[in-house]
Amino acid sequence: MENDFVVAFAQNLKNLIGEMSISEFARRVNIPQQTISRYLLCQREVSLRNLIAIADHFGEDIDYLIGRKD
């Protein structure tokens, strides 16, 4: 399922999560850990609802998360 959007999102999410565990991050944004893992492995496209939750959590622009802005 790799496409530019999925790959960019996975890389940006990895950078933002940093040293935090996937389980801790998943708990904070109320998204199942398996879903976060699949995002990071480029196995699933992020839903709009989850994209907004992640952007809000980090105080980031959605365009940044999907690779449309540095």
Where are these regions (language model features)?
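DNA major-groove recognition helix of helix-turn-helix/homeodomain DNA-binding modules
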Residues: 49-64
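Short, Lys/Arg-enriched C-terminal cap helix and immediately downstream tail that follows
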Residues: 16, 48-49
